[in-house]
């Protein structure tokens, strides 16, 4: 477990339309629970990379971009399968603002983690839209956080984004731990090491 008496916290910036954010949630939550460290999910809206199709005549740059995108997509599917997660939704052109506002509401009511898991699961299994206010409200109500009022929370969403960017966040998933910033769940071993007080060998 983490060192007693220390005010450790894991802050994780996520976007519901970002598959890497979904893949990071389970392992991060499990580690936080094991170490007894609070996990705070923070909304950060991002752009979605578009997977381009092969054309008969491609420039070298176009081909390299396509190959990278194809590898990225295959990599996501590989790790999703290991976690038994569905990744069937198309995130291209999706506006996640409403779902991120729901996360702010869920955080205020103490159900942010369960809300995020539910939204990720439903969206990526293609059973809900991220801009569906009714679905978001229903999830929050089921979790004991009724009365979702998105209109009053846009300013807070912008404030959270500005604060995160001032701390070095530029994408998702990104971790803010012990005054340091890490991009991607591949840094979880290092984050664990920091939270354990650097008592073990450096995980590199």
Model-based region annotation:
Residues 23-123:
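Structural alpha/beta surface segment adjacent to cysteine/selenocysteine redox centers
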